[in-house]
């Protein structure tokens, strides 16, 4: 059965996973609560599967040239009404691998993220800068004030 990128991304979002990993010869993997898990019913990926996934998503000729020259490229990919994804495609051990980070359409509020209420008040100030820092996967890209 050929690899279905659309199915894998829909599974990622439905399962509330954070990342999709495409690496030969593993089946597609999703990161759920910090652990990598196989997407049920999928088979190990072939070189044609990972190359096909990149070709399906990457339509910018400049980015494609960058990928061919540098053996790595970062870009974004969107599925309307579902989510946006930050994509890193790279060569690993002579084959193409892909990691995609989901960026949900619905952004959580300060309250939903259990941040101190002072954050909302500080955001209303006319001058200054507020830095919110954290580790990868801690939800910082989801903050909307």
Where are the regions that the model predicts?
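N-terminal accessory targeting/assembly segments
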Residues: 1-27, 45-49, 58-62
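Short, conserved phosphate-binding/catalytic loop or strand-edge motifs used
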Residues: 30
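P-loop NTP-binding catalytic core
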Residues: 33, 37-42, 48-51, 55-133, ...
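ATP-binding Walker
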Residues: 138
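Conserved small/polar residues in nucleotide/adenosyl-binding loops
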Residues: 143-145
């Amino acid at each position: 059965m050929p690899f279905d990128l659309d199915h894998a991304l829909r599974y990622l979002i439905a399962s509330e996973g954070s990342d999709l990993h495409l690496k030969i010869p593993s089946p597609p993997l999703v990161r759920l609560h910090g652990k990598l898990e196989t997407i049920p019913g999928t088979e190990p990926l072939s070189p044609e599967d990972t190359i096909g996934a990149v070709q399906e998503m990457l339509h910018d000729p400049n980015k494609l040239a960058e990928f061919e020259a540098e053996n790595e490229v970062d870009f974004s990919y969107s599925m309307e009404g579902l989510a946006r994804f930050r994509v890193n495609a790279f060569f690993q051990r002579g084959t193409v691998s892909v990691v995609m980070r989901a960026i949900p359409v619905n952004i959580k509020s300060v309250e939903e993220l259990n941040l101190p209420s002072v954050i909302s008040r500080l955001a209303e100030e006319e001058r200054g800068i507020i830095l919110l820092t954290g580790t990868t996967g801690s939800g910082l890209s989801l903050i909307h004030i």
